[in-house]
Design a protein with these regions (language model features):
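Catalytic strand-loop segment that frames the active site of acyl-thioester-processing enzymes
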Residues: 23-54
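Hydrophobic beta-strand-centered segment that forms part of the acyl-chain substrate-binding groove
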Residues: 68-101, 133
């Protein structure tokens, strides 16, 4: 269960609606504190029609979003975050024409640094085709940032 379910859902919705994620048509399941971020296979996401491989940037985006959402599940209040480091190891090629999913897990948190593992899979979560490792920094908002955020959220809710 996320530390703050309302905050988590707000951040989850924000992340999957970033313009780049909308273009990729990323979607997700936020029913747990380790959400699954997904994208359906599309030919336009291939690095090359000759290889048939999904572009590495698509996988990188999925890993980054899944990791950020998993970190957001730990927050009691809004915090600023940034990806400091990310590594993806490919174990095999994903199967064409099947959705790609990523789930992440925060395995260690030291002060403002969080270490997150993720796995990329298709039909069977126990058979990942790639593994990710991410390091994030996070910090509480200043009072001015909190006030600006509250004003923004009120505007968004009024729409």
């Amino acid at each position: 269960m996320p530390a703050n379910p309302v905050l988590f859902q707000t951040l989850f919705n924000h992340y999957i609606n970033i313009p780049h994620c909308r273009w990729l048509k990323i979607y997700g399941d936020s029913s747990s504190d380790e959400p699954i971020i997904s994208v359906d296979w599309r030919d336009e996401l291939l690095e090359s029609p000759k290889t048939g491989n999904i572009h590495g940037g698509v996988i990188t985006t999925l890993v980054d979003m899944a990791s950020a959402c998993t970190l957001a599940a730990l927050f009691q209040q809004f915090e600023t975050t940034a990806t400091l480091d990310m590594r993806i190891d490919y174990l095999m090629q994903p199967v064409p024409d099947q959705p790609i999913h990523v789930r992440a897990h925060c395995y260690r948190q030291e002060g403002s640094i969080a270490f997150i593992r993720s796995h990329c899979f298709q039909n069977d979560e126990t058979r990942p085709f790639a593994l990710g490792m991410s390091t994030f920094i996070h910090n509480p908002l200043t009072q001015a940032e909190q006030q600006a955020l509250q004003a923004y959220l009120q505007q968004e809710q009024a729409k």
